[in-house]
Amino acid sequence: MADSALINLSKLFPEASLKRKIFANTVQSPIESCLSIKQLNNIYSEISSRCKANPEKNFFDHSLNVLNINYKITSGAASSIPKTGPVFVVSNHPFGAIDGLILGSILQSQREDSKILANFLLGMMPEVQDKFISVNPFGGEKATRANLKGLRDAGQWLKSGACLATFPAGIVAHYRPEMKSIHDGPWHTNIARLARKHSATVVPMHIEGKNSSLFHLLGRVHPRLRTAMLVRELCNKCNSEVNIRIGSPIPANQFKGHETNESLVRYFQMRSDILSHQENTEEETPLPTEQVEDITEKQDDSILAQDIENLPPSALLCEKKAFQVYVATADEIPHILQEIGRTREITFRAVGEGTGKALDLDQYDQLYHHIFLWNSETSEVVGAYRLGLVDEIISKHGTKGLYSSTIFQYSDDAFDSLGKTMELGRSYVIPKYQRRGTSLSLLWRGIIKFVRRNEGYSKLFGAVSISDDYHPLSKGLILRFLRKNKLQAGFAKKMKAHKKPTFEKNRSLKAFNYPDALPSLENVSGLVSELESDKKGVPTLLKHYLQLNGVILGFGVDTSFSDALDGFILVDLDEVNPTLLKKYEGED
């Protein structure tokens, strides 16, 4: 065996020893053939020759060319890796050496000042030693010393403002009985410590695929058998294509909510894992065409304006420039109400909801007050809410008079403990105004004014929707967070959903069973936005209610509204932060 070989098993024995001579003359060749070591040495020889012939091309690209392995970035883009400042790219580790070659190729295409913190075996090749910072995953006193040096070097590299990448699991993905799947082991907390200490932007990545069944079967017998198979696994990936997903960068200022490095590194792992659940689907029509009616045409502006003119002065709750917020009952605004039903349907269909009818109006619209935002310059209904005085509605119609009774069944004394409350719902802002935060703020200024006008009321409740357009895993993540952190269990016993949500039973949630890694709704939103094809996070309205110190009373599925997941939420204005409340009330 030539000394230039990448791997020479005879070197396991002392040079010139009898054992080495016997091994080399008897079993070395068949063992190296069985483990594909001979094939790897031939591959490495070709790579080395190409590096010498064309030094302008980096080692990683030469290696992938010789192996005939192509990678395809199916989500995100390599260009999302920041070009300056300390960056830490973290990825799962499904294959072994191939992962390092692909990661190196991607990084070198974006930043020349990039290195990989990885198994020392990946850095054995002299052509690439300057691109690796080595650690030893095999344990022992010597490994501990080497790893301390590797972590120090990694810290210095990040401190210099350079780019570092790693596989935080330390070892290749394997079968995990507790998850009943092939998956990375828990990621090492040192990765979070380094990222936090050096304020590095973290970029999650996910490499799609897994090693052979034989690899995982032998690994269940003994982990070292898995290690022995790694060369064979590298060689059997020749002539293949690997899909890569690159997530959104996580800036260092988002680390603060994680009190421990264990929590933070679990969050990094989740951000990588969630990428594997993305779906490559084109946008579809939210409702089957045979069930959808054409939306009614808008009425003449003068007809709508006449409804506004007919309102009493007290109907105006607040205004700002061309925008006015009014409150009215159904019989006071017959034409505006039709426009509300029209624009509701437009808005909800755009996010996979909606009734499928020409107008989104129902019998509850006749029992509720309507708070709507009017643009007097363009004669547009920009958005609206409807509010019902619960005690008055129940006294006349029972709990069946509440829209939420279509989703939940209430006990007879359900509302006794809440006192005087208002049910709000069917909230929307038309698409062209949704990026303007002032629309929702103005509506809420009007809502608060209306509540204050009605003495004794301070509590608002209603269903906030998470549309069926969301990925089932997104809904499961949101639901689990709310149940753990925001559920008021006492009231939940007094209501029963007609159809209970089942998203928490999603098998994929097992990979995200680290509740401490999601200390805030913003962390959940980060996962959700990676998963959703349109990059939407947790619904804005849900975040808005929770910002107002809202609590969840229960969960249900609205079967009459495109099977939207509804969280039944309660906001007590007397419990809202006074500074925040003044902001909504329009006070300085």
Indicate residue ranges for each PLM-predicted region.
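Short amphipathic alpha-helix that is part of the acyltransferase structural core
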Residues: L317-H370, W374-L389
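Secondary-structure boundary elements
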Residues: S109-D113, Q156-C163, R196-T201, A350, ...
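Membrane-anchoring hydrophobic helices of lipid-metabolizing enzymes
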Residues: M1-H93, G100-I102, S109-D113, Q129-D130, ...
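Conserved N-terminal entry element of GNAT/NAT acetyltransferase domains
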Residues: E290-D331
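Acyl-donor binding region in acyl/amide transferases
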Residues: E345, T355-A358, D391-V551, G556-D566, ...
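Non-catalytic C-terminal accessory region of glycerolipid acyltransferases
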Residues: A2, L9-E15, D113, L148-T296, ...
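Conserved nucleotide-cofactor-binding alpha/beta core module
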Residues: D113-N147, L151, L158
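Short acidic (Asp/Glu) patches
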Residues: T74, T84, F88-V90, G96-L103, ...
